[in-house]
Amino acid sequence: MSGYKPVAIPTYPKLGEKITQDTLYWKRYKTPVQIKEFGAVTKIHFSPVQPCTYAVTSSTRIHLYGQYSQEPIKTFSRFKDTAYCGTFRGDGKLLAAGCEDSVVQLFDISGKAALRQFSGHSKAVHFVDFTADKYRIVSGSDDYTSRLWDIPNGVEITSYNEHTDYIRCGCTSALNNDLFATGSYDHTIKIFDGRTDKSVMSMDHGQPVESVLLFPSGGLLVSAGGRYVKVWDILKGGQLLVSLRNHHKTVTSLCLSSSGQRLLSASLDRHVKVYSTMNYKVVHSFDYAASILSLALAPDDQMIVVGMTNGVLNIKHRKPEERKQLQSTTKRHPRYRVFVRGKDYMPKQDDIFISKPVIAHLKKYDKLLKGFHMTEALDTVLQPQIRNQRPEVTVAVMNELKRRGTLKNALAGRNEKQLSDLLIFLLKHLVNPQFVPILLNVAEHIIDIYSPVVGQSSVIYKQFIRLQEVLEKEINYQEELLKMLGMMDTLFATMTTKKESPWEEPKPILPLSSQ
């Protein structure tokens, strides 16, 4: 028994992960810093100017954080009820926020008391933003209205009452001082011009709208609601360009990278998706521990901040670029004494040669095979940890049992659970070209052994039906491939021109018949 050879596990080439420039770029973020807030984080907004300060709206407070601070550098708590949508002005000096008590408040970053309070809404205000000229504020409320406010005079300029449900999001144009968009739970996105008394454009998202975003150029608008992210062409009258469905739950927040070439979306499914704005394909994805309500990307893309339903603020900082040290490409050649070392050594007759014994560490299935416990060896490699993560080990043991002529005996005598596990493995890997030769033999033995009693268990019966479907599908697939191969051979044969072989004998020239 000392000459037992362990089962040889074949190795197969694996397809490596496709590494793209986006993968390398978005993976260059450090381990996240997590901060616990007082409630669910409903809004995160970065100051457009340096230093990189961002406002976090949670419960009845708005906290201001520095780029690397883990404690708030300032807190605005002058709210009677839940605060919403803390948003910086373009110069970073003022902050506006809505509240559950229907009041819009305006704060100076250097102070704590409100500079202005705009009253006019009758229900909670969930959306607040500054216009591009910095002198007006746009707000949207649960009273179905959106309003335009004058900051210097503290009065309402105009009011729009076109939505038929809660207004929960909106945005202003970075180029046009009068243009802004609102998204509502009535499934519509409406674009307003502050110089007119009604909307200039309307789009139907098809789901309650949770977030809207205007591109810096002003030509495209992105809306998020339900599981969909939709891109609209404003210059073509609100034409739908693309509808993205890459999330499994409601999409709650949107943001753009500093260059505008990447679009980020956050969802209740705990994922952040990164899209290319060239083809709107997902180029990267982040996973988080809880459902996401808010998302923001720093103006220089150095930070990603995510707010979750459990009140946790997740902050990722980008790693600094590593300086590549120039190394000499010239290898140092070994010295002369390296080559002449030991050339004069002569072994002696009384030298003792000791060889270190090699201890063979056998796997559990090898020990069972060594002891001729065939059924137990097969049961070992059918455990979920082995059959799911290393199916080649399971197939190698089956191949060894076939070589010994004991495969059929090892497959016999199984209960419902053991047979079900074996059929699950077959259904998963039977059409794998690497495993087909041995698994077809295993399938034949199982059909021969258990076909008389297959009707006694509904689970086994369904798996046998599924096995039949898999085999029929694979046979049809092979037949189609053979037909295609025949057509290709015919095409190649017709395209090939016959060339005269130099070894062929020339045809004899027959004499002309005499007149």
From Swiss-Prot:
> Could you tell me the superkingdom of the organism this chain comes from?
Eukaryota
Keyword rRNA processing attributed: yes
List, alphabetically, the SMART domains matched. WD40
Q: Which GO terms describe its biological process?
A: ribosomal small subunit biogenesis; rRNA processing
Q: Where are the WD repeats?
A: 36-75, 78-117, 120-159, 162-202, 204-242, 246-285, 287-326
Q: Which UniProt keywords apply?
A: Nucleus, Repeat, rRNA processing, WD repeat
Q: Where in the cell is it found?
A: Nucleus, Nucleolus
Pfam families the record matches: UTP15_C, WD40
Q: Which InterPro entries match?
A: U3_snoRNA-assocProt_15_C, WD40/YVTN_repeat-like_dom_sf, WD40_repeat_CS, WD40_repeat_dom_sf, WD40_rpt
Q: What does this protein do?
A: Ribosome biogenesis factor. Involved in nucleolar processing of pre-18S ribosomal RNA. Required for optimal pre-ribosomal RNA transcription by RNA polymerase I. Part of the small subunit (SSU) processome, first precursor of the small eukaryotic ribosomal subunit. During the assembly of the SSU processome in the nucleolus, many ribosome biogenesis factors, an RNA chaperone and ribosomal proteins associate with the nascent pre-rRNA and work in concert to generate RNA folding, modifications, rearrangements and cleavage as well as targeted degradation of pre-ribosomal RNA by the RNA exosome.
Name recorded for this polypeptide:
U3 small nucleolar RNA-associated protein 15 homolog
